[in-house]
UniProtKB/Swiss-Prot annotation:
Pfam families tied to this protein: DsbB
SUPFAM superfamilies per UniProt: DsbB-like
Superkingdom of origin: Bacteria
Subcellular localization(s) per the UniProt record: Cell inner membrane
Organism: Pseudomonas syringae pv. syringae (strain B728a)
A GO biological process held by the record: protein folding
Entry keyword DNA-binding: no
Any one cellular-component term (Gene Ontology): plasma membrane
One of the record's GO molecular function terms: protein-disulfide reductase activity
Record-given protein name: Disulfide bond formation protein B 1
Transmembrane segments: 15-31, 50-65, 73-89, 145-163
InterPro entries (alphabetical): DiS_bond_form_DsbB/BdbC (IPR003752), Disulphide_bond_form_DsbB (IPR022920), DsbB (IPR050183), DsbB-like_sf (IPR023380)
Amino acid sequence: MSDNTLYLRREKRFLVLLGIICLALIGGALYMQVVLDEAPCPLCILQRYALLFIAIFAFIGAAMPGRRSVTAFETLVTLSALGGIAAAGRHVWILAHPSDSCGIDVLQPIVDGLPLATLFPTGFQVSGFCTTPYPPVLGLSLAQWALTAFVLTAVLVPACIIRNRRKPY
């Protein structure tokens, strides 16, 4: 088996793992919403969309046969992570400055108008405020954990692309 095939397999395993982690994070958010009664705000929902896009692009990328198609989907994963960084970063900033609102009046109709809000309202419909402080998990707020996950994704996926493309094929 050539080094090219080994690197591509490693990348695909990484993408599958990333997709599973993103789906687990969405599942955790749904658990906190339904069981712990923590209502999601517009920025929480946008972070769920980013996680969902990362998972979808990661799974599709892992199923692609060639190096170029895998790289294309890894690029889409990175772009989705950057969108998640924007939403989570804004959410962290709002939690640090509770006097400023995330503009629920402005964002709520936009987020609730997205297709998944009508198809799966429990998971993708806004029902809370961004300034609501929920108990931290291991010392960090959920928005801080999400920001950490998005930053790691936005750094590790391109690093994987660069590292594996430097290898001679």
